[in-house]
Curated annotation (Swiss-Prot):
Transmembrane segments: none annotated. It comes from the Bacteria. Belongs to the ABC transporter superfamily. Energy-coupling factor EcfA family. This is Energy-coupling factor transporter ATP-binding protein EcfA1. Keywords: ATP-binding, Cell membrane, Membrane, Nucleotide-binding, Translocase, Transport. Pfam families: ABC_tran. The gene is ecfA1.
């Protein structure tokens, strides 16, 4: 399979957690564009988190294929390909493994047998990129939730991934910390040309994306740019998703397009 513009491709993927259970994913096909921000959105039970598990190998497909950089993922090559993908999970407390910040970032590098001098350089650079270098010696209980997620991103960046998956990574943060983290992710994507995949139930987060995949009941419900998705926003509420505030207001005002950021809403008003 040759697709130079996609980093990950799902082709007719189906999955069930138990052989006698209903399928969580049903004949799912989509492409993740290389170097872009893709948001995979859906309510609970839509299959979005299962997609993340398949991408990082926690689960294996029952039928269909997953390709990474044009290579079909198999048991033989998975470990090699997996090293190129980093993931940040929902609960920041569950992913902090070091006693202090810099040890947490170094943990993955130690597992990859990175030499000490190189490890020190990578840890410092990664913490600097997420504005946490001054807190390198802090214990986790001295950090806010948003700061812990920054450390989690630094731990991933230190491994030089091509893809970062955010699995509901902002869902436990307050609105300010959430927006700060999304701004950081946008900066990291731009500076390193990293592919971002955000798994979320929050359509506000999808507004940040270049490419949006909406999941419903284990199938792809809609796919396109954020503008394309929100220009037909009425269908999103029927599958249990809550529209972002500026789009709700824009619809109430009767404007032609549904897609609107907070800044755009202010301009309209």
């Amino acid at each position: 399979m040759e697709d130079k513009n996609s980093v990950i491709v799902f082709k007719n993927v189906s999955f069930q957690y138990q052989s006698d259970a209903s399928f969580t994913l049903k004949d799912v096909s989509f492409n993740i564009p290389k170097g872009q921000w893709t948001s995979i959105v859906g309510h609970n039970g839509s299959g979005k988190s299962t997609i993340a598990k398949l991408m990082i190998g926690i689960e294996k497909v029952k039928s269909g294929e997953i390709f990474y950089n044009n290579q079909a993922i198999t048991d033989d090559n998975f470990e090699k390909l997996r090293k190129d993908i980093g993931i940040v999970f929902q609960n920041p407390d569950n992913q902090f493994v070091g006693s202090i910040v810099k040890y947490d970032v170094a943990f993955g590098l130690e597992n990859h047998a990175v030499p000490h001098d190189e490890m020190h350089r990578r840890v410092s650079e990664a913490l600097k990129q997420v504005d946490m270098l001054e807190r390198a010696d802090y214990e986790p209980n001295a950090l806010s939730g948003g700061q812990k997620q920054r450390v989690a991103i630094a731990s991933v960046l230190a491994l030089n991934p091509s893809v970062i998956i955010l699995d509901e990574a902002t869902s436990m943060l307050d609105p300010d910390a959430r927006q700060n983290l999304l701004d950081l992710v946008r900066k990291v994507k731009s500076e390193h040309n990293i592919t971002i995949i955000s798994i979320t139930h929050d359509l506000s987060e999808a507004m940040e994306a270049d490419h949006v995949i909406v999941m419903n009941k284990g199938t792809v419900y809609k796919e396109g740019t954020a503008i394309e998705i929100f220009d037909h926003a009425e269908g999103l509420t029927t599958i249990g998703l809550d529209l972002p505030f500026p789009i709700k207001i824009n619809q109430m005002l009767g404007h032609q397009t549904s897609f609107l950021t907070y800044e755009g809403l202010v301009d309209q008003l």
